[in-house]
């Protein structure tokens, strides 16, 4: 039945539409953030994307590796760090982590708006509506009712289409820095560049005109040394270490950078070749599997398209590489934990800033290199040789710091061995740093109970106007 509009009802409808447009609640012309809107047109891709929900196990990495608590002392990751899960959990996990705190207002909390930047297609929507200044200004809480749809279709595809796109301006600027603008890239390169909007190293700028903006530190290249030099020239630090007072760098997840340096990247094997292969449905029709995960789960469609070796051979080879990387990673962690506490002992013994500067530089560089290698998820497959090389330099620099500390402590009259606190478990390490985990967890529980439902209600109301 056709609805007959009176002049009065028509005028009212027009007024409501104008009001919605003025208030900025209309969906963006470029981005449809609601993943379910793609379900009918791209059903096979949508259903496989939805299957990333199967990656639901929560693995507490601080329980697995308690030394991480010490390495990140004074930084949010010492509170809480879980292994990454499937794309379906991106928004859920950033809401639940202790790192984002328990803010109660838009001006409250430890984290900036930029912490949403890789979690949702709502991010490009808000940037398109408000501009980057509008999006990046303020605290993380501000985006709570806006950033609600998890990583999905609109992050990598043009609105309502399968055509790939880079949806984040800061990523496009980074590609231009490497002289590879997305518009001029090959189809194969684009298949990796859409992933590189998020699976990269980044930091939050502190310049006057781009305060809080996300930036990839690629101005001098993507190697660990190039980015280290870039940060050093800026005198940039993510935080000051609570124990050693070192101006620290926190690597995020430079998967794209390490992939480029490895055998797959050097041979132009894209991210999607291994993690989102072409597969056949029950009718024999090919489509791109959007269940991003372990290539060995789809061996014939991934590794098997290039490698003649058996799945068993390739799995065992990767396991061997993981063991080698893990061994060197653990050695670096042991050296760094001791270096941090020995640096504290030197400060306590009266060391000056001038005496400590070269030591803290060694610690900074060592931990940055350790983090660059270990935060690059999948590095044992992507670039095992580069991982071992970088971790080797991390161990060397930590050892350099400890040799200098031993000499300085002797000069300061410290003749007894340094007493290291018990950091053998997550709880003991956090207690040694004076962290009130009981309060943090209680505050987070209150936040989840009282704030998250408000965000969901506001988002539902807004999306009903699209």
From Swiss-Prot:
Name the catalysed reactions. Answer: 6 Fe(III)-[cytochrome c] + NH4(+) + 2 H2O = 6 Fe(II)-[cytochrome c] + nitrite + 8 H(+)
Q: What is its EC number?
A: 1.7.2.2
The answer to whether the entry has keyword Calcium is yes
Q: What does this protein need as cofactor?
A: Ca(2+); heme c
Q: Which residues of the sequence carry a binding annotation for heme c 3?
A: 87, 195, 198-199
Q: What is its main location?
A: periplasm
Q: Name one GO biological process term.
A: anaerobic electron transport chain
List the subcellular locations: Periplasm
Q: Which Pfam families match?
A: Cytochrom_C552 (PF02335)
- State the family named in the UniProt similarity comment for this chain: Belongs to the cytochrome c-552 family.
Task of the protein: Catalyzes the reduction of nitrite to ammonia, consuming six electrons in the process.
UniProt name for this protein: Cytochrome c-552
What species was this sequence derived from?
A: Shewanella sediminis (strain HAW-EB3)
